[in-house]
Amino acid sequence: MRFTVKGKTEAADISGEVEAAVSHRIPVIGLYPAMENTVVLELLDKSGKVTDSQEITITTDELPDKLDDAVKPVKTSGESAFELTMVYGQRTTFPFAYDCMGDIRWYMSGEFTSGIYMLSNNRMIVASNEAFMPSQDKPQTTNLYEMDYLGRAYTMYYVAVEITMK
């Protein structure tokens, strides 16, 4: 099964695939905020050929106020090596990702100021700032979560000792 969120340009399309199954849950990411998004669902055979397809429309809410003008492209080629560019850290309290045209296509609704670390399996390690907050005795967060772009947590790590750089 393949999904494609249609972009404002063909280069801005975001696609992904899930393994064949009797029933599917499609993890659609890359929807534009505050608009009707067209998503193409394609059923693939074993060779990758499309056997059936369907278009659906998904309407989304507006971005949080803090993200309204977060990306201001001055000049863009309209192409990128990556479908989405992730932004987090510094003064960014809502981690977000934008496409080749500078449009925000994903954001994390919780405020995460402690850090996000991208993994090679399309997941991330998120440092929690909700519990066991850093203190003078323990300057870093103690809870880390491995999660995906949909916010599904897979593993929680508890850091019991202080991490120091030498």
Q: Whereabouts are the PLM-identified features?
A:
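Exposed beta-strand and adjacent loop surfaces of beta-rich binding modules
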Residues: 1-2, 92
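Histidine-/acidic-rich catalytic cores in large beta-rich domains
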Residues: 21-29, 36-166
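Extracellular low-complexity, O-glycosylation-prone stalks/linkers
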Residues: 2-13
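Short, conserved catalytic-motif segment at the N-terminal edge
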Residues: 12, 17-20
